[in-house]
């Protein structure tokens, strides 16, 4: 293999410029060699910052790094769904692969349901690769990388991280380690469920309206957590307007928010109602007594450039303290949204 200038690649991709196809080939070969040595469940030590769906929103990914810290100073775990729907899936995925190549221990990437040949041919990544590179070659290289991504991660042996959720076929994390992950995402079975399932306020298991995976209730997650000695499950997969969600908590309440700006002093007579919705700059720490058995992290602000949601990253310290850092979309000058361009059908 020839030497890759990873710093040059990072600069090009961060500025929304494509790297040559020959660089993509070598980058994918190098990352494949790294991933093939990784387990189905990657062990990660805290502190770590956990990130949810990105969906090709490159400039919002750069905003995430701005507020979360640059790698390798900050250790990152991304929960999949790097591509599709956004305008810059190619640059987004290649940027993350370049970081993985340069900092393999500080950048962990696991598979989402959109890291799939079938799904990317429907929701945009395939078409984007063909449009930007003139053929489907880059898409094929990336799809091979999809097959080698881990299915989950375990932080300090206490926090199970997965893209979607649980499976009725899986009662222990050791069972996940035995799965053959180096394949296209199956239409059913344990591997499919891990990438597609969702928590829901039901008892036991339910059919998923997605047509893949399952819905699972608080009782299911509590049994799984107890059997595997887990504190909680961290997952992504679902748009959350507030950027994060605590599932199956005994407490339904607003949590204290801390901003980087000093709060203004208001006397009681002049105080006006306060909007308790999370806002960019807020840091929300969940009290131990109010933790749920499952949390959702969503990291694509203003999803599809029209949903109006904020996003979050989950910062875990050595005690598994949950601190959600809220952020919004990149400024208009840096957002990179093409102008005078119709929204493709797959956004609707």
UniProtKB/Swiss-Prot annotation:
Swiss-Prot/TrEMBL GO biological process terms: double-strand break repair via homologous recombination; negative regulation of sister chromatid cohesion; positive regulation of double-strand break repair via nonhomologous end joining; positive regulation of sister chromatid cohesion; signaling
SMART domains: PP2Ac (SM00156)
Pfam families registered for this protein in UniProt: Metallophos (PF00149)
Compartments reported by the entry: Cytoplasm; Nucleus
One term of GO molecular function: protein serine/threonine phosphatase activity
Superkingdom of origin organism: Eukaryota
Keywords: Cytoplasm, Hydrolase, Manganese, Metal-binding, Methylation, Nucleus, Phosphoprotein, Protein phosphatase
The reaction(s) this protein catalyses: O-phospho-L-seryl-[protein] + H2O = L-seryl-[protein] + phosphate; O-phospho-L-threonyl-[protein] + H2O = L-threonyl-[protein] + phosphate
Enzyme class, broadest EC rank: hydrolase
Cofactor(s), by name: Mn(2+)
Residues given in the record as Mn(2+) 2 binding sites: 81, 113, 163, 237
PROSITE patterns, A to Z: SER_THR_PHOSPHATASE
Residues with PTM Leucine methyl ester: 348
List of catalytic residues: 114
Biased composition regions of type Low complexity, renumbered to the chain: 269-280
GO CC entries: cytoplasm; cytosol; nucleus; protein phosphatase 4 complex
Cofactor binding notes: Binds 2 manganese ions per subunit.
Family recorded in the similarity comment: Belongs to the PPP phosphatase family. PP-1 subfamily.
Protein name in UniProt: Putative serine/threonine-protein phosphatase C26H8.05c
Organism encoding this protein: Schizosaccharomyces pombe (strain 972 / ATCC 24843)
